[in-house]
Amino acid sequence: MFNEIIKTVEWGGKTLELSTGKIARQADGAVTVKMGNSVLLCTAVTAAKAKEGIGFFPLTINYREMAYAAGKIPGGFFKREGKASDREVLVSRLIDRPIRPLFHPAFVNETFVTCTVLSYDPETPVDILAIIGASAALSLSPAPYLEIVAASKVGLINGEFFLHPTLDLLKTSQLDLVVAGTNDSVMMVESEAHLLSEEQMLAAVKFGFDSFQPVVNIIKELAAEAKKSKLEMQDLYPAELKNEIKKLFAKEIEQTFAIKSKQERSTNLELIPEKVLKHFADDIESKKYNNYQIESALKSVESDILRGNILQKNKRIDGRTTTDIRQITCEVGLLPCAHGSALFTRGETQSLVSSTFGTSLDEQIIDSLEGEYKERFMLNYIFPPYSVNEAMPMKAPGRREVGHGKLAWRAVNPVLPTKTQFPYSIRVVAETTESNGSSSMATVCGSSLALMYAGVPIKAPVAGIAMGLVKEDEKFAVLSDILGDEDYFGDMDFKVAGTSEGITALQMDIKIRGVNFEIMKIALEQARLGRLHILEQMNKVISKPNNEMSKNAPSTTTLKVDKDKIRDIIGPGGKVIKEICETSGAKIDISDDGTVSIYASDKDKLKVALDKVKAIAIEPEIGEVFNGTVMKILDSGAFVNYLGNKDGFVHISEIAEERIESVGSVLKQGDIVKVKLIGFDNKGKAKLTIKNAEKDKSSANPKPKNSPKEHQEPEKRDNGKKRAWNEDNNAETTEVVTERKYFS
């Protein structure tokens, strides 16, 4: 019944299996991918006819993780998979980026690729399997997919690269790198690194590239045995059409590209297609050419002019050389009520960034196939339409915003302090207020500035830069700090972020084949020099974290208690912890290991809650002195409450040095007294004394000998009074805003 084709290869110590002909046989291309206990179904379907009047290739990639793949039932009311998670969006983009450039340029048929995780093994990288499966499915479909792509994931521990790092290994790995490409070219790189050098990053890319070559070969074998036919494609446009457009409009295009202002240049460029279409109106009517052919030929002419200026004249749109960085302006502390804020401007790209601290209760809860976990650091990238002067409504975050935000997250995350060092959750919001190339790298720079201003003890400032490439045959030029048009017409978008000591994130998308490792080496070195220049400008404003935090930031402290005391702090049905929170106004979070985190809007509320927790969790020692309250008077003595929830008995003989006739003659209910713990009776009840305690009253409520060390938070600043707007603290140089002296 089934005509199944199966191909296997030993890869990185595991067996990779690709099969077709059994599942989803009606799809144009369908491949089942297996490695370990992971199983994915990848399908590709192409529309029979081209989509008219569209100026781009309508490729849609959908990666889905089914809950049953990990033996789970989805959460939520409906108990079924819904909107794509951020993880699914990111993997969808990861699949799209190396595949999209490899279709025939004239192909505009709608194409849908779906990769579904059917069985999930945490020991295998399902995102890599999805890229491989998508490539294999497309190779079996009629779509003119010109090259076969494969991918690999690389880790680094103790100076050794290795394939297929598991989630546990990634916790200690210095590198999490995905590289995808063909037999002869790298097409895509995505990575997070812990301050690695350019040489190490290039070596990692080479290691990953070499490792997936056997996978490319078995996909080719699978496609060859399946013998699926491909759509025959014609040239995107006739050569004579391009020549005529070049002859008539090249001069005007050249003059337009000489305009340095993006807005003015874009406005003038938008007028040219109207003129071109008007010129060819008769040819369109006679169906000699269609609109798409004319617009494509025009884009090719524009590309030739821009690229020719760079390669032949060393002349970029805005007059810079290939290594020049646009003018940089940095400001911090713009938003008085934010915990930290910064405005980073590079040329016509600008990012307004704020940082906010929260409690551990504010951490993002993520439900994944691996299980539920919390994310302490959140970075939200926002790209509003006004940033590029588009008259459009604001929408929910799209795939691009999720992807750019994650790239900036990867760049900043390696320099953040541990939770022990800084027990806050952190949210960074970066709104792109202007955009003309590399807004994600502006987000990285602005985030670093905002975090340092807020007082987050990051290990080092972080900056990012986007590199470009123009290549014709053997001649090429690597561009630093690319503009939007240089990205659009160029051959590579290469983003590198890091500190002065090394790289923290790298993302590379290549649109052409033939970019070798020598070009990558040059690009990495040029990016390093550009990154150091940007860091130098940022350091003129703020070079290290402030010692003071905003007065609006929550006060916090943490302490470690015995695990046996957790139930006492919580109380039956949460009664005790709820009472502490209500009476103190604080928030309390308790971890399973006995770490108690307390947060409050001010230090007074924090102290009230801390004292109550200590009273429950910390056992007093004999000889310690406490403040107590007389609760009940008896003939033989008095009951005194101390440490909030503990009671002890003071015998009449322990009330005063001299003999007294009655307890009531010295003490009254409600009196505040000093008491010393002198022992316990045979029932474990505390025995207290007042007469000896008065001599040691200076040591009342001492810190117990075994009391845990508490986190000491930085001092807080007054955001309003010390950050008032005036001309002095906004004086600018030609490059950067001078450092603001907000703190005494």
From Swiss-Prot:
Record-annotated S1 motif domain positions: 623-691
Subcellular location: Cytoplasm
Reported cofactor(s): Mg(2+)
NCBIfam families xrefs: polynuc_phos, PRK11824.1
Superkingdom field: Bacteria
Matches recorded under Gene3D superfamilies: GHMP Kinase, N-terminal domain, K Homology domain, type 1, Nucleic acid-binding proteins
Family stated for the protein in its record: Belongs to the polyribonucleotide nucleotidyltransferase family.
Biased composition, class Basic and acidic residues, residue ranges: 707-718
BP GO terms, sorted: mRNA catabolic process; RNA processing
Entry GO CC: cytosol
GO molecular function, one term: polyribonucleotide nucleotidyltransferase activity
Substrates-to-products reaction catalysed: RNA(n+1) + phosphate = RNA(n) + a ribonucleoside 5'-diphosphate
Pfam families, alphabetized: KH_1, PNPase, RNase_PH, RNase_PH_C, S1
Domain KH: 554-613
The protein, known as: Polyribonucleotide nucleotidyltransferase
UniProt key word Acetylation: no
UniProt EC number: 2.7.7.8
Ranges annotated as biased composition (Polar residues): 727-736
Keyword Transmembrane helix on entry: no
Predominant location: cytoplasm
Disordered: region residues: 691-744
Stored InterPro entries: ExoRNase_PH_dom1, ExoRNase_PH_dom2, ExoRNase_PH_dom2_sf, KH_dom, KH_dom_type_1, KH_dom_type_1_sf, NA-bd_OB-fold, PNPase
Chain positions recorded as Mg(2+) binding sites: D487, D493
Keyword terms: Cytoplasm, Magnesium, Metal-binding, Nucleotidyltransferase, RNA-binding, Transferase
Source species of the chain: Rickettsia bellii (strain OSU 85-389)
